[in-house]
Amino acid sequence: MPQATYPIKKFADLRMYIAADMFRYMTSTRAKAFLRAWYIAGFRYTFFMRCCRYYSHRLWHRPLFLLCRIALRHYSVKYGFQIPWQTDIGPGLMIGHYGSIIINPNSRIGINCNISVGVLMGLTHDIEHHVFYYPTIGHRVSLANGVKVIGNVHIDDGAVVGVGAVVTAGLDKDAVAVGVPARVIAHTGSAAYVGSFHPATIPLMNEAVKASN
């Protein structure tokens, strides 16, 4: 499994990740907003997913880790989300509606991304060289209903992938892609789809951009 970019090792990190996820739904981090967000399937699932990731790091957290894994498994079956807690996902994840979503645990998803019902992120296998390839998603990326992202594919920051598209090749920054296979039809970016995000995630995105240059 690739080295984690978003390990959530400190309790302050856990609070920030949960707040960033909640902000994507409620545009607020107040206690009342948390109570309203708790009834949203996507937020409830990511809450336990983040907790699993945090509590997995220390032996004395093992009881809480096991409880969170049980809760995560329950909501995985209830909502149809197959997003393992080990998956490397940045803060500010928004899951639109509940239904089948399948993410390979070795995939990587950036900060402030949208995932919709029917999204699949899967591997490809180079049989000759015995190598597996997994998708990576940048920041502020929006994947619409039924999108499939397969294999050694990188979708750059700000990209939008339309309903039912199958992505088998990389997409550049702010690309808008549709179809099977996905083809770029514009470079207008994802601002209209991603919307507002938690201020604490902005420096994280800036640091990630600097690190990639």
Regions found by a protein language model. Give the residues of each.
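Right-handed parallel beta-helix
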Residues: 125-129
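Terminal amphipathic alpha-helical/low-complexity segments used for targeting or macromolecular assembly
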Residues: 1-79, 190-213
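C-terminal segments of enzyme domains that contribute to small-molecule binding surfaces
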Residues: 131-150, 180-213
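Left-handed beta-helix
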Residues: 79, 84-85, 90-91, 96-105, ...
